[in-house]
Amino acid sequence: MTDQIDRSRKEAVRGEDAARVLESPAFQEAMQMLKDDIVKKWGDCPIRDVEGQKLLLQLHKLANKFEGLLTGMVETGKLAQLNLDALRDESAARKLFRRIV
């Protein structure tokens, strides 16, 4: 049980850290600049440069994946915090019953 609590605490802290990163104006500006630059270079890329287009597409997908990973960490952290809150608020009788069963 304590392993689960420790893991939940770590996930909750990691989620809070990820949320601070996502909410940071500097991060938001940097990600927007990155995405805008990728789209601009993609638009400027000659049609015959198929390899360059593929690389830019991969870079665009990678940028979105990175943001998605951070968002996933935030959501996992929120769920972990809800689980910790539920364990904390659980009655003593229910805790005893859960240990017996």
Model-derived segments and spans:
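Intrinsic-disorder/low-complexity detector
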Residues: 2-101
